[in-house]
């Protein structure tokens, strides 16, 4: 058996002299891809952190609104101060919700652009798609809680009106209050009031005040109605996205199984490689 290790080393030196930058040229496309997406990922991470912070502030504002509305029936403070605080929190929630919705829409566009430019399995496309779904879900939950808080405040106003009507000696049901609210005819309760009955007059004033509060509440709900419609569209689109993600995960599991099989075959081929036997015969210990 002839030792040809020296010939192999000579051929390797000749190849290095002919192609001194061959390895660099081979690896450069991968390096270019990494460097090309680095700045996109940094910008994406900043946007994700911003939306996460905004979502946390939105959730905190919604909780504050719920607590403020709960004080509407039990607090001894002047109702005017409670209403000012409630209106201020509601305006902040509406403004913050619009900002978050715009940022989520921009992230959705970035995800689609990254998928078209770098492929659906690229890092920037997968990260932006997954974070968009998670942040959108958090935003949807916060806005749902906000809607529940406003609906509960509406019920609180109706309960307070019903209490004041009982003070005036008027027994009405919730449906009757709803009808009166829609028609705005609260003066029907002043027909039999005596001039010297200050308590009844105060109760009527309280009812009219609650009616105005309900009108303001309806106005706030109308302001965010368009935002809720846009969120409904996002929910429908997100369902399709989740189905695609589930399919990609299943494909990844299949590819992983195939890769393991290929690795086992490669190990077997390496063990059966005739070059390994040649090197063993060329070893000085066999001389």
UniProtKB/Swiss-Prot annotation:
Membrane topology: Peripheral membrane protein
Subcellular location as annotated: Membrane; Golgi apparatus, trans-Golgi network membrane
A GO cellular component annotation in the UniProt record: SNARE complex
Pfam families (UniProt xref): Syntaxin
Sequence ranges assigned to domain t-SNARE coiled-coil homology in this UniProt record: 204-266
Keywords recorded for this protein, A-Z: Coiled coil, Familial hemophagocytic lymphohistiocytosis, Golgi apparatus, Membrane, Protein transport, Transport
Primary localisation category: membrane
Xref: InterPro entries: SNARE, Syntaxin, Syntaxin/epimorphin_CS, Syntaxin11_SNARE, Syntaxin_N, T_SNARE_dom
Family membership noted in the UniProt record: Belongs to the syntaxin family.
Name listed for the protein in its UniProt record: Syntaxin-11
Species this chain originates from: Homo sapiens (Human)
Lineage per the UniProt record: Eukaryota, Metazoa, Chordata, Craniata, Vertebrata
